[in-house]
Amino acid sequence: MAKSPANNAAQRVRKKVRKNISDGIAHVHASFNNTIITITDRQGNALSWASSGGQGFKGSRKSTPFAAQVASEVAGRAAIEQGIKNLDVEIKGPGPGRESSVRALGALGIRITSIADVTPVPHNGCRPQKRRRI
């Protein structure tokens, strides 16, 4: 016998517990293909996250500043629901969504206390990949 649809509808949905954390860190990973924003508390526990691809942008539109802005608005609203009021922003990567994601977080009413560039730069470490020839 087939299962009744009432069983599927009766599944429990867990609601996120409001944590009331006022200070946090926004980690912005801006690559050439996508932008990922993760908002954590001071200890590094993730409160919310969003990406350009997760907001419905596909292909080359993921790497636009507008897509990064939309993703940071989504992550910022979820963080505000958790009680975030102040953010330190850490930006990693050379992508086009670096500046627009920080502006979007500030426009939501979150106070940005510091902006740091934490892009990893090698001290002549590993050999890079071969040059692309088109």
Swiss-Prot record:
Keywords, sorted A to Z: Ribonucleoprotein, Ribosomal protein, RNA-binding, rRNA-binding
Gene3D superfamilies: Ribosomal protein S11 (3.30.420.80)
InterPro entries per UniProt: Ribosomal_uS11, Ribosomal_uS11_bac-type, Ribosomal_uS11_CS, Ribosomal_uS11_sf
SUPFAM superfamilies reported in the protein's UniProt record: Translational machinery components
Single GO molecular function: structural constituent of ribosome
Gene Ontology biological process terms from the UniProt entry: translation
Function recorded in the entry: Located on the platform of the 30S subunit, it bridges several disparate RNA helices of the 16S rRNA. Forms part of the Shine-Dalgarno cleft in the 70S ribosome.
Subunit-level organization: Part of the 30S ribosomal subunit. Interacts with proteins S7 and S18. Binds to IF-3.
Family: Belongs to the universal ribosomal protein uS11 family.
HAMAP family, sorted: Ribosomal_uS11
The name this protein goes by in its record: Small ribosomal subunit protein uS11
Organism name: Delftia acidovorans (strain DSM 14801 / SPH-1)
Lineage, top ranks: Bacteria, Pseudomonadati, Pseudomonadota, Betaproteobacteria, Burkholderiales
